[in-house]
Amino acid sequence: MLQYGAPVITATRETGMDSQVVLALSDTGAGVPLRELALVGLTAAIITYFATGWVRVLAIRFGAVAYPRERDVHVQPTPRMGGLAMYIGVASAVLLASQLPALTRGFVYSTGMPAVVVAGGLIMAIGLIDDRWGLDALTKFAGQITAASVLVTMGVAWSVLYIPIGGVGTIVLDQVSSILLTLALTVSIINAMNFVDGLDGLAAGLGLITALAICVFSVGLLRDHGGDVLFYPPAVISVVLAGACLGFLPHNFHRAKIFMGDSGSMLIGLMLGAASTTAAGPISQNAYGARDVFALLSPFLLVVAVMLVPALDTLLAIVRRTRAGRSPLSPDKMHLHHRLLQIGHSHRRAVLLIYLWVGIIAFGAASTIFFDPGQTAMVMGVAIVVAIVVTLIPLLRRGPDGAQEP
């Protein structure tokens, strides 16, 4: 069997009436390359940080500037195209990873990391065009499908799907189902990140948090499977993305000197989709025990984490606008981040609150690879209660007449 461009040994273990499929790559036992992963992530951060200043000048020269609109939060013209700087950092870090002895074998057995560079370059270029000249929704959607198709063509695709209810178990996907599932998830995450990019530092911070969570999860898989190269792609992709987001964030946090634009938000979404797919897509969950099955479902929860805020925001917006007799696509200033500002949170605090909510879900999902799921759920429950209280503090401080208490 060929999986992610890697030779996979398939073994069938008969136990009575049960049959388990065990997938193993032909190169294991190298351990967890933590130092190399840290170096690659740091490289992405440093290069992105310094490239952003150059891209800002370039954006102003080419007229890629976001002028304030009625529904926008920013009040002064701000250059876009930050995704170009992030892509420079990503491509440079992946190139470095391909030259490091401890990580090179991941490129031999997998096409996941080169696929991200190629597809990421395509989605970033589409975003650059939109940042400068603007694209209609259909053209942009076609570009997203094309970029996601490049990932699939180069071997980044779900091959099995685990359904933990109704006794369904593991479903081996045929080629059509694999392609459709991968395209649907990837394009959904791309649009989720594009949609959530409404406050300074929000998309970059959410990309950083979710990428770090996927990296932690991937390191846990590497640890538990003796450094199996199957888990190199999600570890490298996620740490590179985390580094790029970290390097861009100082330029983008309130008040932003530059916006990442669609070139950046769509790049983040595509890389998160690729990292999640390579973390769980090729794994046969029947080969593991109950605890590992829960852990291997965590990439789904990581996808939920990055999509939770925009999905909830979108649903509420559709209901709100439909009840008001307006088009669901009509713009307004009632999005989640607008509401956080309206109840009394500052711009920075609103962003940090959304970081908190996404971080609870993302790291809660990732931690199942290290801790008991029941204990993880308890900690997450406490964290959610704390997050609710912190979110509602401005309302709790108000008196009965709605005035702020001293």
From Swiss-Prot:
It catalyses: trans,octa-cis-decaprenyl phosphate + UDP-N-acetyl-alpha-D-glucosamine = N-acetyl-alpha-D-glucosaminyl-1-diphospho-trans,octa-cis-decaprenol + UMP. GO terms for molecular function: glycosyltransferase activity; phosphotransferase activity, for other substituted phosphate groups. It is an enzyme of class 2 (transferase). GO terms for cellular component: plasma membrane. Pathway: Cell wall biogenesis; cell wall polysaccharide biosynthesis. It is a multi-pass membrane protein. It holds the Pfam family Glycos_transf_4. The chain crosses the membrane at residues 40-60, 83-103, 109-129, 152-172, 176-196, 202-222, 229-249, 263-283, 299-319, 351-371, 376-396. Its cofactor is Mg(2+); Mn(2+). GO terms for biological process: capsule polysaccharide biosynthetic process; cell wall macromolecule biosynthetic process; cell wall organization; lipopolysaccharide biosynthetic process. Its EC number is 2.7.8.35. It is found in: Cell membrane. It comes from the Bacteria. Its main location: membrane. Disruption phenotype: Cells lacking this gene show drastic morphological alterations before lysis and are unable to grow. InterPro entries: Glycosyl_transferase_4 (IPR000715). Inhibited by tunicamycin. Keywords: Cell membrane, Cell wall biogenesis/degradation, Glycosyltransferase, Magnesium, Manganese, Membrane, Transferase, Transmembrane, Transmembrane helix. Involved in the biosynthesis of the disaccharide D-N-acetylglucosamine-L-rhamnose which plays an important role in the mycobacterial cell wall as a linker connecting arabinogalactan and peptidoglycan via a phosphodiester linkage. Catalyzes the transfer of the N-acetylglucosamine-1-phosphate (GlcNAc-1P) moiety from UDP-GlcNAc onto the carrier lipid decaprenyl phosphate (C50-P), yielding GlcNAc-pyrophosphoryl-decaprenyl (GlcNAc-PP-C50). Mycobacteria use decaprenyl phosphate (C50-P) as a lipid carrier in all known cell wall biosynthetic pathways, rather than the usual undecaprenyl phosphate (C55-P) usually used in Gram-negative bacteria. Belongs to the glycosyltransferase 4 family. WecA subfamily. This is Decaprenyl-phosphate N-acetylglucosaminephosphotransferase. It comes from Mycolicibacterium smegmatis (strain ATCC 700084 / mc(2)155) (Mycobacterium smegmatis). The gene is wecA.
